[in-house]
Amino acid sequence: MSYVYLLECTDKSTYVGATMDLDRRLRQHNKEISGGAHATSIKVAEGHAWERVCHITGFPDWKTALQFEWAFKFHSRKFAKKMYPLERRMRGLRILMGLLRSTSKSILYETYPSGGPTIVWESEEARTIYESII
C-alpha cells in the first residue's frame, strides 16, 4: 500500500513525502535507522525530532501516490512563507482534497478502488486547522 505523509518537526517546520512503510520511514527521518531525506536529517542533527501529523491512504498505485505528493507540495507553496508551516500544509491539503484529481495527468479520485484519498489524522491540532479552513 502507498501512502503520502506529513511530518512536523519540533521546530515547527514540515515535510511531505511518500512511502510504502510509514513507521519505517519515520524512523529513517529521525535517524533511528539508515535512510531518510537530507532535509530532515539536518534537523535531527540539530537536536530536533519529527512526528507524523497525518497520512493519506487509498491510492491505487505508487505512481498515483507520487502525483498526490507532488501536488500536496505544489499547493502548499502557494501561501506566504511567513504563514505558520502547518497551516500552509493544511491549506494546500484542503485545496487538493477538493479537486477531482491531484494533477491534470492523474486519474480521477472517484475512479480509485477505495473511492478516493482518505486522510488519517495523527494530530488533533492539524485536524482542527484543516477543518477550520473553508
In which residue ranges do the predicted regions lie?
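Conserved short loop/helix modules at catalytic or binding sites
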Residues: 22-66, 71-87
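Generic intrinsically disordered, low-complexity segments enriched for polar/acidic and small residues
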Residues: 2, 12, 26, 35, ...
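Residues that flank catalytic or metal-binding motifs in active/ligand-binding sites
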Residues: 1-3, 48
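GIY-YIG nuclease signature motif recognition
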Residues: 3-9, 13-21, 25, 29, ...
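Alpha-helical structural elements
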Residues: 10, 24, 45, 63-65, ...
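Residue-identity detector for glycine
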Residues: 17, 35-36, 47, 58, ...
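Boundary/linker segments flanking structured domains
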Residues: 69, 73-134
